[in-house]
Amino acid sequence: MTKDSGKAVMFYSCIIGSIPGQTATAIKVADTFVRSLRERLDQVFIINPAEYFEPGMDGDDLMFMWEQVQRSGLINIWRFQSMEDIEASFGLMGLKVPPVWSGKDATFSTGCTKEMRIALDMQRSHPELQIVGPGPEKFFRRGDYGVGKFFDATISNANQE
């Protein structure tokens, strides 16, 4: 797939493993929303990482694999999952948004935060790259390091007595 084919290439950065116990739901949420995008958008090739998720891969494995694609220079639309995307996806599945998903977006994910850094870096050398979704400043508001397999859990007050 190249930009020369006449199709736009979109990468969809979404929550996969950042909500403990919700990986299967996260994959359904992403797949449902991307399917609706594919039905609505003409001549757009959408890369959905949820379609390629392999249980057992850790965050480093996943980031290494996707960074190769992300730095290829072939992406011209980089969409980060918004709260509205998540709400629309649950609606398409005929479900209400559960409390654990309420208010979430790509900024909740350490993987998506790293991907935003990559997207901004790529945009410097490819100024035509469109970045869609929550603004970059929202990704970088947290300085906490993720703890666990690939979840965004943090140890709070660990050094306080």
Task: Map each language-model feature to its residues.
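Conserved catalytic or regulatory cores that recognize and/or transform ribose-phosphate-containing ligands
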Residues: 1-161
